[in-house]
Amino acid sequence: MTSNNKVFTHTDPVLLPVLAELRGREPIFHTPEFGTTRADFEKATAPDYWEASASGRRYSRDFVLRTLDEHPPVNADSVGWESYGHALRRLGPDTYLITYTLRQIERLTRRATIWQSTPQGWRILYHQGTIVSAEEDDAFPSSWLQSPPWLEKR
């Protein structure tokens, strides 16, 4: 069974200008539009920002900023990363969820970032990356075809 990708990549046409603006800032920490200095990163992240990494670990803003100081991020374009399937949903006044798929050299991940527009500019409230197995369908894991979990005897 294949998924209907339109469900995952639909953006209300009214939001397309916002999507274009935020798409230029993703993947976060890896584009010049997002920023390149600690001051840029501090400005672009809310004081209570946190993220859940592709490994499932949770990281605070302070930890992320210290890590970026020690290991400056690579530019996504210069290392051949490709993002696609961008979609945007308004969560509330001036708050948006952008989702997309990121293909890096060594892995494929689904990304989600919650952005907020402020008088000082865009900032992120939360970010998550989830590793995707190449064998998995968007709708459900391929292993479910053989033995759907809801049919297992308990």
Where are these regions (language model features)?
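A beta-strand edge to alpha-helix "cap/lid" segment located at domain peripheries
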Residues: 2-43, 48-154
